[in-house]
Amino acid sequence: MNDTVKKPTGGRGDDPLPAGAALSAVAPHEPVSVVLAGGGTAGHVEPAMAVADALKALDPHVRITALGTARGLETRLVPERGYDLELITPVPLPRKPTGDLARLPSRVWRAVRETRAVLHAVDADVVIGFGGYVALPAYLAARGVSPRKPRVPVVIHEANASAGLANRVGARTAQRVLSAVPDCGLPGAEVVGVPVREAITSLDRAALRAEARRHFGFADDARVLLVFGGSQGAASLNRAVSGAAAQLAAAGVSVLHAHGPKNTLDLREPQPGDPPYVAVPYLDRMDLAYAAADLVICRSGAMTVAEVSAVGLPAIYVPLPIGNGEQRLNALPVVDAGGGMVVADADLTPELVAREVAGLVGDPPRLAAMTTAAARVGHPDAARRVAQAALDIGRTARLARGATGGRP
């Protein structure tokens, strides 16, 4: 496969860096080459892009190449952020025996061959893996690229509270293993949090609130509920919240609801004097959405929890009821700290939404306490820590090659 998606000129990967940002960088004529393996869903792509931005901030000469597949969100998100993307064969790891499982070995080795070609072409010094469809081939390929370059060091980041198969395999030979939370199932993992883009970690909700509410058409003094279910929406959240529209309006609650590009909402006709119910397929400006909101109802994927807690937004988390319950585990640190609550997907009804939302938005002191608690759980420096670990390892690898005239 090995298709290349080039970054647009003027993208984030080309941004100028602050003076002194690269004091410890390798000389410009020998830039460190970093390959990011984290494609498929936004939960894998966004942490990778946050780390890419942090790499550029630490070393403006670093070469960054992202691995992805033609079916993943990375085909849009990576070029938009200004980075090069190399496409390989997708390797979905089925949770249950299916036809995909029977085809897995041939797909894996095809993807490994393609990834080895990429690592060789970009002269990779280090691979950073985030799990997902491209991570397993990247970890296997890094074990042996060519006779001249038999091994590329690997840094792994596990965002979920329960590590996935790809990262469990990769962690066995990785140079560094980093995680969002303790006890993720990877021995020796160092807790750094989930990498979140700087636009979110530096977001001042209070300072941006007036602009954000004007952007979405809410009054300055509105009580705003934000609802989203990930990049594709969530049917159960859509049904429960839209079904509570009348009760929410009666309680004076405005709603900003991202229902997903493939979904629609069955909303009643608004009555005169009702606060706005703004329904959109997708939110391109999550910074404004977070700033406009007083409360959010959302899933609890690792990236969602990291962003919501980073901005100090009180949350009602509704874990996706699949897998090993990792979404519920992702939310527990914030919930235990007092920054949110968890509602099982099966228990999410219009009546519950109306009751809990009205109770929370009508209690400003409680919301303020939840805001403080949520913000305490966040790790705003996670992206920088992952990037620094990778640069340290990559520089060592490149310097070793320079000292020996080739790869050890």
From Swiss-Prot:
Superkingdom as given in the UniProt entry: Bacteria
Described purpose of this protein according to its UniProt entry: Cell wall formation. Catalyzes the transfer of a GlcNAc subunit on undecaprenyl-pyrophosphoryl-MurNAc-pentapeptide (lipid intermediate I) to form undecaprenyl-pyrophosphoryl-MurNAc-(pentapeptide)GlcNAc (lipid intermediate II).
Full protein name: UDP-N-acetylglucosamine--N-acetylmuramyl-(pentapeptide) pyrophosphoryl-undecaprenol N-acetylglucosamine transferase
Pathway, per record: Cell wall biogenesis; peptidoglycan biosynthesis
Coarse class of the protein's main subcellular location: membrane
Family listed: Belongs to the glycosyltransferase 28 family. MurG subfamily.
Topology term for the membrane: Peripheral membrane protein
Gene behind the chain: murG
